[in-house]
């Protein structure tokens, strides 16, 4: 069973609200909008110390009752973390080791193997779900290359392999959906996203091709990636299509 906290992802895809500002206020709003999960983006929130991060996660979980994905995205993968890589990894590792810490952690496939393994080992030891992610903001890799990326994520220890790409054509989008479907039919949990205008519809379509997570914004003016709908919009469209 694939789950994050007590949320069973085998039943249906979860809508993840990306928290990138005013953490407690926006988290409450996301919960009211119907979010299933919260992604706490430490890099976008500007949180760099363990105490503040731990308190933020504790309050958000207590106030909303929703499971939390912890992300501290590197600049090379589209994030805003500007500190040392060792500090980024240490912060992730320490937070996922806390009893009342996050329920899942996102670590990039591109992170150095030693650093990536450190985060994954800590997560597994504390029963936390591991998301191994890969982001390409300039293109969509070829079909077989995308399959290989997901395979490498699972070999690295992913419970969920996440792949976000920038399509240049409708064919790119179709290939991504094919990759998601193949992975799901093979029994693997994936999250696949085509960003930007061409891929915007995948945020509500990909769940029907095997994607177990779809990310959404809480405020329309502020989003973490191009093409994100708002949480309530995604929930409504998914309900109409189910």
From Swiss-Prot:
Homodimer. Involved in the third step of the chorismate pathway, which leads to the biosynthesis of aromatic amino acids. Catalyzes the cis-dehydration of 3-dehydroquinate (DHQ) and introduces the first double bond of the aromatic ring to yield 3-dehydroshikimate. It catalyses: 3-dehydroquinate = 3-dehydroshikimate + H2O. 3-dehydroquinate binds at residues 39-41, 73, 203, 228. It is an enzyme of class 4 (lyase). It holds the Pfam family DHquinase_I. Gene3D superfamilies: Aldolase class I. Pathway: Metabolic intermediate biosynthesis; chorismate biosynthesis; chorismate from D-erythrose 4-phosphate and phosphoenolpyruvate: step 3/7. The active site is at 135 (proton donor/acceptor), 162 (schiff-base intermediate with substrate). It comes from the Archaea. GO terms for molecular function: 3-dehydroquinate dehydratase activity. The lineage of its organism: Archaea, Methanobacteriati, Methanobacteriota, Stenosarchaea group, Methanomicrobia. The gene is aroD. PANTHER family: 3-DEHYDROQUINATE DEHYDRATASE (PTHR43699:SF1). Belongs to the type-I 3-dehydroquinase family. Coiled coil: none annotated. This is 3-dehydroquinate dehydratase. GO terms for biological process: 3,4-dihydroxybenzoate biosynthetic process; amino acid biosynthetic process; aromatic amino acid family biosynthetic process; chorismate biosynthetic process. Its EC number is 4.2.1.10. Keywords: Amino-acid biosynthesis, Aromatic amino acid biosynthesis, Lyase, Schiff base.
């Amino acid at each position: 069973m694939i789950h994050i906290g007590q949320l069973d992802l085998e039943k249906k895809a979860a809508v993840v609200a990306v928290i990138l500002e005013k953490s407690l206020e926006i988290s409450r709003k996301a919960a009211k909008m119907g979010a299933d999960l919260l992604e706490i983006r430490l890099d976008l929130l500007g949180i760099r110390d363990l105490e503040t991060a731990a308190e933020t996660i504790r309050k958000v979980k207590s106030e909303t009752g929703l499971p939390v994905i912890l992300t501290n995205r590197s600049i090379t993968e589209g994030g805003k973390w500007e500190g040392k890589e060792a500090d980024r990894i240490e912060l992730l590792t320490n937070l996922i080791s806390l009893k009342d810490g996050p329920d899942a952690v996102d670590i990039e496939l591109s992170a150095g193997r030693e650093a990536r393994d450190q985060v994954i080992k800590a997560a597994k030891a504390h029963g936390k779900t591991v998301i191994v992610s890969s982001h390409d903001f300039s293109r969509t890799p070829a079909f077989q290359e995308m399959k290989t990326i997901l395979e490498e994520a699972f070999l690295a220890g992913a419970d969920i392999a996440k792949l976000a790409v920038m399509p240049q054509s409708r064919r790119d989008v179709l290939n991504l959906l094919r990759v998601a479907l193949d992975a799901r039919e093979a029994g693997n949990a994936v999250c696949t996203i085509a960003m930007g205008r061409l891929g915007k519809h995948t945020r509500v379509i990909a769940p029907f091709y095997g994607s177990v997570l779809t990310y959404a914004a809480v405020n329309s003016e502020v989003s973490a990636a191009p093409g994100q709908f708002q949480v309530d919009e995604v929930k409504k469209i998914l309900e109409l299509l189910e």
